[in-house]
Amino acid sequence: MATTSSNVENFSPQIIKQVAREIHGLTNDPPEGIKVFSNDEDITDIQASIEGPTGTPYEGGIFKIKLVLGKDFPAAPPKGFFLTKIFHPNVAKNGEICVNTLKKDWKPDLGIKQVLLTVKCLLIVPNPESALNEEAGKLLLERYDDYSKRAKMFTEIHAKLSASSSNNISEGQQESLPGKKRVAVNEKMCDKKKKDKKRALKRL
């Protein structure tokens, strides 16, 4: 049940077909650790769940997110929201996601898959410089252990309630992912950024 009105009537048949095709592909062959739920009644309201990446304060959690396609999509980026409460510098208290891919770095050919991978990468490498949650951004930069404890507590309370019902995202589906290599490259980039960030934080 979307809280925003549908923009389907504002889309050309070509855009509707393009979005429907991509969502269908993502539903049947999702990126690793991500599950996409199709909404036949409103393709402009896309919901997905993301597994908390290993080695982060979000590990073990299942985070539900929503992407809302505006009437100018794909010329304008979708809006992203976490439906699951999360303690993260780039997620506002109302769930709004702040990431450059959804703002100044958006390109019409990026597609829904790239947005989902970017949001997952944000869980691995937060960006405190563009924080929507200033408290989380400050803790990340100045007291990482406190930030990690708070983020883990939020994960434990809010993101693990539905984890048991979504455990099979990574088990049954991961073995048959033809696009896994591309995702692995993306994950390596995230890992490298994470290590660089940790080194930088240690020097502070």
UniProtKB/Swiss-Prot annotation:
Keyword Cell cycle: yes
Gene3D superfamilies the UniProt entry points to: Ubiquitin Conjugating Enzyme
Chain intervals with Polar residues compositional bias: 165-176
Active site: C98 (glycyl thioester intermediate)
Segments of this protein annotated with the region Disordered: 165-204
Superkingdom of the source species: Eukaryota
GO molecular function, one term: ubiquitin conjugating enzyme activity
UniProt pathway: Protein modification; protein ubiquitination
Reactions mediated catalytically: S-ubiquitinyl-[E1 ubiquitin-activating enzyme]-L-cysteine + [E2 ubiquitin-conjugating enzyme]-L-cysteine = [E1 ubiquitin-activating enzyme]-L-cysteine + S-ubiquitinyl-[E2 ubiquitin-conjugating enzyme]-L-cysteine
Residue ranges with Basic residues bias: 191-204
A GO CC term assigned to this protein in UniProt: nucleus
Residues that span the membrane, as ranges: none
CDD domains the UniProt entry points to: UBCc_UBE2S
Pfam families: UQ_con (PF00179)
InterPro entries registered for this protein in UniProt: Ub_conjugating_enzyme, UBQ-conjugat_E2_core, UBQ-conjugating_AS, UBQ-conjugating_enzyme/RWD
Similarity comment: family membership: Belongs to the ubiquitin-conjugating enzyme family.
Known role: Catalyzes the covalent attachment of ubiquitin to other proteins. Acts as an essential factor of the anaphase promoting complex/cyclosome (APC/C), a cell cycle-regulated ubiquitin ligase that controls progression through mitosis. Acts by specifically elongating polyubiquitin chains initiated by the E2 enzyme UBCH10 on APC/C substrates, enhancing the degradation of APC/C substrates by the proteasome and promoting mitotic exit.
Record protein name field: Ubiquitin-conjugating enzyme E2 S
Organism encoding this protein: Nematostella vectensis (Starlet sea anemone)
Lineage: Eukaryota, Metazoa, Cnidaria, Anthozoa, Hexacorallia
